[in-house]
Design a protein with these regions (language model features):
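Surface-exposed loop and turn segments in beta-propeller and other repeat-based domains
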Residues: 172-189, 230-235
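A flexible loop/linker signature enriched in serine peptidases of the S9 family
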Residues: 1-4, 10-23, 27, 36-43, ...
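Conserved blade-ending motifs and adjacent loop-strand segments that build the rim/top face
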Residues: 138-143, 181-199
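Active-site neighborhoods of metal-dependent hydrolases
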Residues: 393-412, 458-513
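Divalent metal-coordination and catalytic microenvironments
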Residues: 255, 272, 277, 300, ...
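Metal-associated gating/positioning segment near the N- to mid-region
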Residues: 301-359, 379-380, 386-389, 415, ...
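Histidine-rich, glycine-flanked metal-binding segment
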Residues: 263-304
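Divalent metal-dependent hydrolysis catalytic cores, especially in the metallo-beta-lactamase
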Residues: 328-348, 365-373, 399-411, 421, ...
Length: 513
């Protein structure tokens, strides 16, 4: 965050050993200095109008992040100069300050998880700096973010992945109902294809967000003028970083080599030459080994191509914290998985982890993902599709964030699913889908041009008509045998017939439940 006088930038930096640290650096550049505050997992940094007090949310421990220093999670105030911390409340997330000096935050009003719930609403609450006198300020059904402007005159919120601006000020004792489709007061859509990381400038005169690497800002005065059109472009904040590439030359010798050539040959005493990040040659023991290659004798071992887990669900991080060491990624890698694809994830986490892995900052397989699903059910994931432009907006948003595939997930009508497929075709990304345990939906998706079907078709047998139809479409099939429709899962099989907990690689990398 920027200090209100624009002279300083404050930010959070994570390390697995030190956890979250608040740093401050001069806006003109220079060496960043860490505040002296208690250790913890902190996220969602904010600053008040005076510039003297910060707010953060402290997380409890989790299966992915360090479980230590997790006592009393919730909202905290931090003195900018001293680093002294004061607990405020266990309620709320995304803290920010209003014009009255009170602390504002959002929380879920319903207990639903957000998958398929028509009552998944979010409320904006305010409280004193001691955590007392909690008041409900605004409510928005299916919203993921609600943030009051620092001057208190407008509210920005994200609904259906789009950024909206409501021209209204809260009143004591009254809950404002924010509704982008049937507003009770002037409400404008600010984003063209959607966005994340909602923020206000210091005086509340402009609201900003990002769509992938593009940072976009709209002055409130411009938005309120007749004929306003959401901005097409923004400021590109991307930077070029060298991809990790080893400079080693290795010759793996005397190994049993499983190949992927046209004949699927198995070479009993084979040699594999590795140069940098490429396989230079594969052959039998007669393959010449050039000078400069370090030989590794793998007698009695088998070398196989890296496995691709095409349906692998994280985790990659939590609340924008990406750990430097992720047991899930390490376990995949140890078991020979060199590429994973996640068909339902969170863009801010999965693509951050993917870029870190590609740059060599974290160790793990190559990571690809659809990020958030294009979801047809009413939830905080809800992605409404009524027109082709709606579908294009969702696909472009995900593509801008890093997606090479999108998840066409349970849009209820066939024409809606067709729009997502057409939008994907136009944008050059691959649509995958889940038929929701419905045989006829799977068949419709294949006929409409889906790239791949996730999860098994829920029938005991598929006959030749379906096999011919499916094969000619060239649509992929990922049955995800550990999660199945209409039958037992293979996960249960392994629990029944093997002692899973004794597997040496699982025992080494996967923590106990």
């Amino acid at each position: 965050v920027w200090s209100p006088d624009s002279r300083e930038i404050l930010f959070l930096r994570w390390s697995d050993s030190e956890l979250s640290r608040i740093h401050r650096v001069a806006a003109r550049g220079g060496k960043a200095r860490a505040l002296d505050h208690p250790k913890g997992q902190y996220t969602e940094l904010a600053i008040d109008r005076s510039g003297e007090t910060l707010a953060v949310r402290k997380l409890a421990g989790s299966a992915l992040l360090n479980p230590e220093w997790s006592v009393q999670p919730g909202l905290y105030l931090v003195e900018r100069k001293s680093g002294d911390m004061q607990f405020v409340s266990a309620r709320g997330e995304h803290p920010h300050f209003g014009p009255d000096g009170r602390l504002y935050a959002q929380e879920r009003a319903e207990s639903a998880s957000g998958r398929g719930s028509s009552t998944a609403s979010t409320v904006l609450i305010s409280m004193s700096r001691s955590g007392h006198d909690v008041q409900q300020v605004a409510s928005a059904e299916l919203a993921t973010r609600i943030q009051l402007a620092p001057d208190g005159q407008h509210i920005a919120f994200i609904n259906g992945h789009q950024v909206h601006l409501a021209a209204t000020a809260p009143s004591a004792g009254e809950t404002l109902i924010l509704d982008a489709t049937k507003p009770a007061f002037p409400t404008l859509r600010l984003s063209r294809v959607g966005g994340e990381y909602l923020a206000w400038n210091a005086d509340g005169s402009a609201v900003s967000w990002s769509t992938g690497a593009e940072f976009k800002t709209v002055p409130v005065a411009d938005a309120m003028r007749p004929g306003f059109s959401p901005p097409q472009n923004g400021t590109n904040l991307s930077m070029r970083v060298a991809a990790a590439r080893p400079d080693t030359r290795l010759a793996l010798t005397n190994a049993r080599v499983i190949t992927l050539n046209a004949q699927r040959d198995v070479i009993d005493s084979g040699t594999v030459l590795l140069e940098g990040n490429r396989i230079r040659a594969v052959g039998d023991s007669s393959l010449a080994i050039p000078d400069g290659f370090h030989q590794v004798d793998l007698e009695g071992k088998t070398v196989v191509p890296g496995f691709v887990d095409i349906h692998a669900h994280g985790p990659y991080g939590r609340a924008d914290i990406i750990p430097q060491q992720n047991w899930d990624l390490l376990a995949h890698l140890a078991l020979g998985v060199t590429t994973v694809h996640n068909p339902s994830s969170q863009a801010s986490l999965v693509f951050a982890a993917a870029e870190y892995a590609r740059a060599g900052r974290i160790l793990g397989p190559r990571i690809f993902s659809t990020a958030e699903i294009i979801y047809g059910a009413k939830s905080t994931y809800y992605a409404p599709v009524e027109t082709l432009d709606d579908a294009l907006a969702h696909v472009r948003r995900l593509k801008a964030q890093g997606a090479v595939t999108v998840k066409n997930y349970n849009q209820p009508r066939r024409d809606q699913r067709q729009m997502v497929i057409e939008a994907s075709r136009r944008e050059g990304v691959m649509p995958v889908a889940e038929g929701g345990a419905l045989y006829h939906m799977d068949m419709n998706l294949i006929g409409d041009g889906i790239t791949g079907v996730e999860h098994n078709v829920p029938t005991l047998r598929l006959y030749d008509d379906v096999l011919q139809y499916w094969c000619q479409s060239e649509a992929g099939y990922t049955p995800t045998l550990v999660v199945t429709f209409g039958g037992l899962t293979s996960e249960d099989y392994y629990y029944q017939d093997t002692e899973v907990w004794k597997h040496p690689l699982l025992a080494n990398f996967v923590p106990p439940a």
